[in-house]
Every structure is written in C-alpha cells, then in structure tokens.
Amino acid sequence: DLVRSRGLGDVYKRQGELSSLSEWDSIRLDNLGIKTIIDLRTNQETLTAPIKYTKANILQIPISVGKIADAPQRVIEGRMRKGDAGVYMEDEYLQFVTDNTDQFAKVLEQFQNEDNYPILISCSYGKDRTGFLTAMLLAALDIPRDAIMEDYLTSNQYIDTSHLADIVKHLSTDAQESITVFLTANEGLMDLAFHKIKKEYGSTEKYLSKGLRLTD
C-alpha cells in the first residue's frame, strides 16, 4: 500500500513492489500523477516480477541485500536456523551504509529535478531499502529522529502477508518466526544503520553531504 511520509508532502511516496498491481492500484497511481518510479529491487527481482505500470518513467537503481537474497529459498527448504533471520536483516541494514551509498546517492539525484515529481520509490515490501532511503530524506529535512522512526515503523501497518498464508502454515515454527522477522520493520535495525553511519562518517549530516552528496 502507498505510504505518504511525514514532511515530504506530495513530492514522494513509497510502496512495496508494483509487479502485481490491481486495476484499482493503477487508478490510484493515475490519480496521484506519479511521474517517476524508482525501483530499488535487484536485477533478479525485477526479472522475476517486472513492473507493469506504463504511465511513469521507471528507473531501476538496484540496492544489494546481501545474504537475505537467498533467505526465502532457505526458509522453504527448512535451512533457516533459529536466529538466522535477525542476523540476515542486520547484515542488510549495515550494507545499506557500507555497500550501497553510491546507489542511494543516485536515487537522491532524481529529487534535484522537479520535473520528476511526484516520485514513487518501490522495493519488495517498501520497508527496508525504501525505508532506509526515506529515513535519509527525512533526516535531510531536519525531521527529529523519533519522528523518522515513527514514519519507518508505519510500514508494519501496510504490509500484506495474506498471500503467504497457505505457504506459512506448512512450515516449521522456526521458519514461521523467520518470516515474521523478514516482514517486520524493526526499530533496532534502523538504529543499527544510524550507528553505522556515525561510525563510518562521524554524523548523519556528514553522511548526507559526503556519502549521499546532498547539498543545501
């Protein structure tokens, strides 16, 4: 579902993947006048489930997700041990800072041209890659950290897992718990990313200016 982030008005929306849009979903995008869709999914993800909406300029800027790319298959095959999911998620959020800063900077370049507005950012569930990017946008607007976190956690109100019901009921308890971890926006993960930013750059402000190349 579409999420409107605090402080960004009608310039920017975030959402999970757009490969299975209903007719109603397409109408909503039409009504919003979305001009640019930035897809943060990996090449493999977009090949498997391409975006079919044709009324906006679609840019693919893939953000790598580390070990978590193999997680769904590991869960289904029963190879996900208790506690693995949390480690995988931590690895993903750390890699946002260590391995994907240039890619996130490319995304933010699109906001420098108002002809691209409104912009919709999309990934698999609209909470991790998109959630981190949104947090950086809000930080650049001097939104307080607690408000940034509140915005990030709103993802939990919109993630629809109904399509997984038939699969999940046949899985082990460990596998079911892993899926819950993967599909939950967790305050600790975003805190981990901010701590990594401080360690690598000294402050969020320096990360925004030196890493993400944002200027006043």
Task: For the regions a language model picked out, list residue spans one by one.
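Short phosphate-binding/catalytic loops that engage adenosine nucleotides
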Residues: 1, 34, 143
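Single conserved hydrophobic/aromatic residue that forms the stacking wall/gate
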Residues: 1-12
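Cysteine-based protein phosphatase catalytic domain of the PTP/DSP
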Residues: 15-115
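A short acidic (Asp/Glu
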Residues: 49, 132-133
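PTP/DSP superfamily signal
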Residues: 103-115, 133-216
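Residue-level preference for the first positions of well-ordered beta-strands
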Residues: 116-120
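Ser/Thr-glycine-rich phosphate-binding loops at phosphate-binding pockets of nucleotides
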Residues: 125, 129-130
